[in-house]
Regions:
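Cysteine-centered motifs
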Residues: 17, 30-33
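C-terminal motif of bacterial Sec signal peptides marking the signal peptidase cleavage site
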Residues: 53-56
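Bacterial signal peptide processing site
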Residues: 58-60
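A short, structured surface patch at a secondary-structure boundary
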Residues: 96, 102-207, 212-219
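Coil residues (strongly favoring Ser/Thr
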Residues: 107-108, 118, 181, 268, ...
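Basic- and aromatic-lined ligand-binding clefts that recognize polyanionic substrates
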Residues: 148-163, 265-331
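Structured C-terminal subdomain patch of bacterial secreted/periplasmic proteins
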Residues: 243-272, 364-449
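Flexible, glycine-rich surface segments
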Residues: 282-283, 301-378
Length: 449
C-alpha cells in the first residue's frame, strides 16, 4: 500500500482524532486498516498527525479559556442620573444595561435589559459565566445595534423617527394611526406590517424576523405582552406615556440611542431640547412675575385651566402631578387641581360644575374635537365659563393621513415647541426663543377649526 493511500485510510478514520481532547489515542482502531508491513509508516504518520492535533487542541483550549475567563464584575450598577421615573440606564460588567418599570394598577412591572454590541457578545452572552450579579441573571440580552423592530405604540415610532430610524421599523400596531406620511404609506402597502390585536398578531410578529418588539401595557383588554413573551421574541415594555413631565418623556430617547448604537446623537437631541425648554420656561415665569408686580394681582396673570371630560356624569381628569398639569404650569397657567398628587382624578359633574364660573380655559376635552361632539355628550358644559368664552383647546391640531394624532408621535420629542404652542393658547403671547420652531401647532381652539 502506498504511503498516500495509507494517509487516506487514516483520514477516513478521523473520528478517533477527536479523542485528543481527552489526550487519548487508540492505535488498535487503526491496525485493521493497514498491513503489518505498513505499521511503521502508520506509526510515523500517527505521531505527525497526533502532534498536529495536540497542538490544535491546545490552541483551541487556550481560545476556550480566553472566552470563559472573564473577570468577575462589580455587583453594583453604575446608573446615570435621569429625570425619568420609569427607566434607568447605566453600566454593568462593561456593557450598557437598563431597568424599565411599568405601573399597572397597584402593581409595578420591572424588566431588566443587557445590551451587548458584537465585541461584548464575543465574550459570551451567558450572564452567569460573565460574572453578572444574581439579580441580573434573568435579564433580557439584546444584541445591539438593533436592525429590525416592531414599534407597537406611536410614541415609540416618534422617538425612532426623530433619530432617523424609519427604515428600522418593520411593524406597527395599526398603520392608520401613523402620522409620518412615508411610514403610513408603507403600512398601507404592507411593506411595514400592521400587527393589530387579533389572534393573528403573534403570527405576524414571529414572521418578521425581529431583533426586538417594543410594546407597552395599560392593564387593559388589548394587552398582549404576556403572549408575546411566551413566543421567546425579544420584548421591551416602554412606559414613556406614564411620565409626568415633558422632559422626562423626552429622555427616553437616550434608551433608543443605546438600542440602535447612536447614543451620542440621542444625547445631543436631548440636551438641545432640554435647553430650549428650560429657557422658554424661565422666560415665561419671569414675564409672569414682572406682570404680577405691576398689577399686584397675580391671579390675573395665571389663567385657571380645566382639563378632561364627563362620561355618564363622571368627570375624568389628569391629577395635579400629571404630564398635563406640569405642562400647564410651565406654560403659565394654574391647573384647577394642581394641589392633588394623584395621577388621575374622577369627580361628579356637579363637583366640576361648581368651578364653572372660575375656569378661564379648558384643555384636552377627551377625544372630542368639535363643539357639537362635546355638547351631544354633555349639554351642561355650555355653562362653563371657558366654554362660553370659546376658549376650549384640543391637542389634535396636527394629524396624519389617516386617524393619527401627532401629539402622541412627534410632540414627545419636541417639548419646547409644545410648551410654546400651549403658552400661546393660554397667555396669548409668548417670549421669543430663536431656536424654537413655532410652526408646530398641536393645540388648537375647537371654535376655530
Amino acid at each position: 500500500m502506498k504511503f498516500y493511500d495509507r494517509l487516506l485510510k487514516i483520514k477516513k478514520l478521523s473520528p478517533f482524532c477527536h479523542s485528543f481532547h481527552g489526550l487519548r489515542f487508540s492505535f488498535s482502531e487503526c491496525l485493521p486498516c493497514v498491513s503489518r508491513s505498513g505499521l511503521l509508516s502508520l506509526l510515523w504518520v500517527g505521531a505527525l498527525v497526533g502532534g498536529v492535533f495536540l497542538t490544535g487542541c491546545r490552541e483551541e483550549l487556550k481560545d476556550l479559556q480566553a472566552k470563559t475567563s472573564v473577570e468577575k464584575c462589580s455587583e453594583s450598577v453604575q446608573f446615570e442620573s435621569v429625570e425619568s421615573d420609569y427607566f434607568s440606564i447605566g453600566k454593568l460588567c462593561g456593557v450598557d444595561v437598563a431597568v424599565v418599570r411599568s405601573v399597572v394598577g397597584k402593581d409595578t412591572l420591572v424588566h431588566k435589559y443587557v445590551m451587548m454590541d458584537s465585541a461584548a457578545a464575543a465574550l459570551g452572552t451567558d450572564l452567569q459565566r460573565r460574572g453578572f450579579p444574581e439579580d441580573w441573571l434573568s435579564a433580557v440580552v439584546l444584541r445591539v445595534p438593533l436592525n429590525r423592530v416592531a414599534a407597537l405604540s406611536t410614541s415609540q415610532v416618534g422617538y425612532m423617527l426623530r433619530l432617523g430610524l424609519r427604515d428600522n421599523i418593520v411593524g406597527v400596531s395599526d398603520g392608520q394611526y401613523i402620522v409620518d406620511s412615508i411610514l403610513y404609506e408603507r403600512a398601507q402597502k404592507n411593506t411595514v406590517a400592521s400587527i393589530g390585536y387579533d389572534a393573528g398578531a403573534l403570527e405576524k410578529l414571529m414572521a418578521l424576523n425581529l431583533d426586538l418588539v417594543l410594546d407597552f401595557t395599560t392593564g387593559g383588554d388589548y394587552d398582549n405582552y404576556e403572549q408575546i413573551a411566551r413566543t421567546n421574541l425579544p420584548l421591551m415594555l416602554t412606559s414613556e406615556w406614564q411620565e409626568n413631565t415633558p422632559l422626562a418623556k423626552l429622555e427616553w430617547i437616550k434608551l433608543y440611542g443605546i438600542l440602535f448604537g447612536i447614543r451620542a446623537q440621542a444625547d445631543s437631541i436631548y440636551r438641545q431640547e432640554k435647553e430650549k425648554y428650560e429657557t422658554l420656561k424661565a422666560l415665561i415665569a419671569s414675564t409672569d412675575s414682572l406682570s404680577s408686580l405691576v398689577s399686584r394681582h397675580s391671579s390675573e396673570h395665571c389663567p385657571r385651566v380645566l382639563a378632561g371630560m364627563s362620561y355618564g356624569g363622571v368627570w375624568h381628569a389628569s391629577g395635579g402631578k400629571s404630564f398635563t398639569a406640569n405642562l400647564v404650569r410651565d406654560a403659565g397657567g394654574c391647573y384647577v387641581w394642581a394641589s392633588d398628587t394623584s395621577r388621575e382624578l374622577t369627580f361628579s359633574f356637579e363637583e366640576v360644575y361648581a368651578l364653572a364660573d372660575s375656569v378661564d380655559m379648558w384643555v384636552n376635552p377627551s377625544a372630542f374635537g368639535t363643539v357639537d361632539e362635546i355638547l351631544s355628550l354633555e349639554p351642561r358644559v355650555k355653562n362653563i365659563k371657558a366654554f362660553r368664552d370659546k376658549l376650549v383647546f384640543q391637542n389634535d391640531g396636527l394629524k396624519g393621513p389617516g386617524a393619527g394624532n401627532d401629539f402622541y408621535e412627534g410632540a414627545i420629542t419636541r417639548p419646547a415647541e409644545l410648551l410654546w404652542n400651549l403658552t400661546k393658547c393660554i397667555k396669548g403671547s409668548v417670549p421669543r426663543v430663536n431656536s424654537i420652531d413655532t410652526s408646530y401647532k398641536w393645540y388648537r381652539n375647537i371654535y376655530n377649526f
